[in-house]
Amino acid sequence: MNKITSEQIKNLFTLPLNELIFKAREIHKKNFEDGDVQLASLISIKTGSCPEDCKYCPQSAHYNVNLKKENLIDVSEVKEAAKLAKKNGANRFCMGAAWKKLRDGKDIDAVIEMIKEVKSLDLEACVTFGSITKDQAERLKDAGLDAYNHNIDTSPDYYKKIITTRTFDERLETIQNARRAGISVCSGGIIGMGESWNDRAEMLRVLANLEPQPESVPINALVPVEGTPLQNQKIVEPEEMIIMIATARIIMPKSRIRLSAGRKYLSNETQMLCLLSGANSIFYGDSLLTTKNNDMQRDKELIKQFKQINKSNSKELINKYLIIFTDKIASTVNY
């Protein structure tokens, strides 16, 4: 496979918005069934006191944030949460722990039991536990784990301004450890942290050139949290999310593109355009680890409406959602 370049990605960024969306839709339709949206539920199994210094994260022990800290929860609590998620329509259950790395001993033993309980409910199991070794990855795979999430967050250059307690290469190493164990990879990033469009292009370039490409790619918009160094960052503009989703779909045609954190700031029209641009997975539930998420009923209505529009395959209907975005991407993208 030919390597994707930052220049190719930046050329996509500067296409007129409607042209970018229709290009992404055509690629999406060749690789996924119409109206296919994966619903993923996310729970925090260990909250706060993380030794990492990620500037966006309220779980870091480095910042004074109003956050209720919790030790590793019981396996039974995870099972009940997974049962509820399935009852509400989720088909993927994700567990996150505020750790720099997964530790051998009681921690890995506990999460292995959690994975087994989730799998017993016929749900996909995904976890994010920080760095993992090759041996740990193999143990998680043996327990039935389907996917490991480890985001690269941003470009290699901008990364140093956001995190100092873990290197970019260490993130790539964990991704490779999961991959070598036969676990599918979930890896994406965050926009709205003060990075440039060049940085966004570089982040997507790194993801697209992983071999193979990640099975899941979460695109997150920063949710500024009081007490973190990024508390005063302005909210990401709606068209920025659409651009990132559509571009990710074009360069990673077979990956699930997940519309992730920050959805609570997006109107139904914006979220609809993200889905029409190739997003085919959302986090479904009241919260994402420590931040609020969309209301579940609102999501049900959104997906119902999306399936109706998608079934019609009408450019006129899709253009209805483009009316509020009359400016071209060139007015948004500043290198």
Locations of regions flagged by a protein language model:
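Conserved Radical SAM active-site core
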Residues: A61-G188, M193-N209
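Hydrophobic faces of well-ordered beta-strands that scaffold small-molecule active sites
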Residues: V37-S41, F93, A125-V127, Y148-H150, ...
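N-terminal pre-triad scaffold of radical SAM enzymes
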Residues: F22-Y63, E70-C94
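Glycine-rich, proline-tolerant flexible connector loops at the mouths of alpha/beta enzymes
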Residues: Q38-S44, N64-L67, C94-D107, Y158-Y159, ...
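Auxiliary Fe-S-binding modules of radical SAM enzymes
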Residues: M1-D34, A208-F325
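Short, charged helix-capping/linker segments at alpha-helix termini
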Residues: L322-Y335
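Mobile, glycine- and charge-enriched loop segments
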Residues: G35-P51, K55-N66, I112-K119, L123-C126, ...
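Residue-level signature of catalytic and energy-coupling elements of molecular machines
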Residues: P16, C54, H150
